[in-house]
């Protein structure tokens, strides 16, 4: 998820021009898109959400990430090919509309909006959990309320200078992970004193790699995929490339760098401590270095992630606000959400208000379910993202003239997505997340049916009648 740092801002800007022609010329080079993608894809889902995956499957989480990276590459590659063949600012929702009709574009757009609302809830909860590192007695909902209010205030103040701050904070996140990798390697080689416990050793037996069996490995896939969430937004940003045909190359390099960072850092973390030492309330990288004499690290690392994570959440709020304006502009949401208030820097307050209600829902959930809220929201957000990824793959079958090998690869990508989604049904502690995502899909589906029979068909009939009258 998570939709991420300056990507969310870019998403909003691209969304505002969703009807623009594909002939627009950008000035971004492919390697710049790769670097931006790395910085904005790394989010709180990785710094905290990966802990759930580790506790679910153990050291084999690194293999989960490799499979998720492969699935992500397949999705991005297909999206990049569609972008190169028919560049459109609307990106994946436009292609769903083109392939299957207006109901698909409508469903894709609202599903994406819903997934981002859940991702914001996940980010809000993650920030609150990380803050409890210093203030363990402060209730989760109180932290969530504070972060939500400040985030809304930042959006109300406007976007001036925000992108530059986003880039700096994306760099902070990446630097924090690089810092962990360097320190962890030093620890593995014995350059730091270990305060009790066994020295680091990589598991080399099946039951050590898969302590929860293949069932646990299957269940963990959703969290690995969730960490790669946001790749579809890079598809939107591909419109800014000077050469649109460079989109697949940019995505390949970006995913390669991300996979190396993820696998190396998590591989080091699971090597350094036992499975039982990880906690959902703490970053796995902080947990991994708990037994070493590094008093500064937890505070520096935690602080860096909270600052950057807050920026990511605020950017996501910018993004969902602009996305709803686009849905409204396309006739897929009430016209109310297009309205902008001049007194508030032309900000679409109705659209922001609906996003704020989503944050309020997360706060209420944190109050009612403080123990499991992060697992539930993260799981459901990850599943909703994968539903859109499935839309991307299915759309490619109708839009692209793929060779047989490309079709086989696309089917394999669908199977990986199916495995990740179905794996959430195997573990009762995260199963509610699946049903939450299903509830969203049912609501969106019913809304699409209503729009088809009560709005779109009616508008089509009126247009046909007007056309006939004109001919007469």
Please annotate each region the language model reported.
Residues 1-49, 54-57, 73-77, 89, ...:
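Membrane-interface "cap" regions at the ends of multi-pass membrane proteins
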Residues 3-4, 25-28, 48-143, 254-260, ...:
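Extracellular loop-to-transmembrane helix junctions
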Residues 94-96, 133, 252-314, 333-381:
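TM-loop-TM module centered on a large, flexible mid-protein loop between adjacent transmembrane helices
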Residues 94-97, 124-144, 176, 240-244, ...:
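Helix-loop-helix connectors at the membrane interface of multi-pass transporters/channels
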Residues 111-124, 233-241, 298-335, 378-379:
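Membrane-helix boundary/coupling elements in multi-pass transport proteins
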